[in-house]
């Protein structure tokens, strides 16, 4: 199979039909052998009912459901494990990611022989104070900590070689750092593509101050593992030295 599109979602019932129609209209004319994988992360609205309805008559669709909300990392991990495509593309279900980017990402990761191509929402339609500025700070810190020159680590739309996502293990909150986990596993051909971003059409954002803080805490954890993972006693030696001083 050429392509798997993995779509994690939580309470996005209003956007599912429109998103599904748009993706299939694009991919049906592409000549690619593809599949769409929806992962409902414990939605409490009618999302799961909508997904079941669209899956009834479409053999390219599959869907999986968590009975409670485990977070985006776990939803992506479940979708990755079920994916069969040589290329795996992820995107959010809120219609802010543009399905027209799918084929461009697919072409870029193949022709440029990349392990990962990450989307970059260079022009964003989000709150400047509550999302744009925190996002810039977060991405600056992630670049410094990881050495990976990406401008939008948290962008939902990304393309991966299947060998990458089958190799790494996602834990809670680490979906933001898949490029870092991939680099640590030896997959270092990572690039980015400027992608179209749309204003949220339905519902409200699920990103808040708590997620921003958690993202930084996860980055600290990842930085610790990167620096001391193979020699953790070096950290404790440094820590004890500081205490002694």
Q: Residue ranges of each PLM-predicted region?
A:
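Acceptor/aglycone-binding surface of glycosyltransferases and processive sugar-polymer synthases
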Residues: 60-82, 87, 99-177, 181, ...
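Acidic helix N-cap motif at the loop->helix transition within catalytic regions
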Residues: 14-18, 45-54
């Amino acid at each position: 199979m050429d392509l798997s599109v993995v779509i994690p979602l939580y309470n996005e019932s209003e956007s599912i039909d429109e998103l599904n129609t748009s993706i299939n209209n694009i991919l049906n004319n592409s000549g690619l052998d593809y599949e769409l994988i929806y992962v409902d992360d414990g939605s409490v609205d009618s999302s799961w009912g909508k997904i079941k309805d669209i899956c009834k008559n479409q053999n390219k669709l599959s869907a999986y459901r968590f009975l409670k909300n485990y977070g985006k990392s776990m939803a992506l991990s479940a979708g990755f494990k079920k994916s069969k495509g040589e290329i795996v593309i992820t995107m959010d279900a809120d219609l802010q990611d543009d399905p027209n980017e799918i084929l461009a990402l697919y072409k870029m990761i193949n022709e440029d022989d990349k392990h990962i191509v990450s989307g970059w929402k260079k022009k964003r339609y989000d709150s400047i104070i509550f999302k744009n500025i925190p996002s810039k700070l977060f991405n600056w810190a992630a670049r410094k900590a990881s050495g990976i020159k990406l401008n939008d680590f948290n962008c939902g739309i990304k393309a991966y070689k299947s060998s990458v996502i089958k190799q790494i293990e996602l834990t809670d909150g680490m979906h933001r750092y898949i490029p870092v986990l991939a680099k640590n596993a030896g997959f270092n051909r990572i690039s980015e593509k400027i992608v179209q971003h749309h204003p949220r059409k339905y519902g409200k954002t699920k990103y808040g101050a708590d997620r921003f803080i958690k993202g930084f805490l996860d980055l600290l954890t990842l930085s610790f593992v990167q620096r001391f993972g193979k020699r953790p006693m070096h950290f404790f030696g440094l820590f004890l030295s500081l205490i002694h001083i």
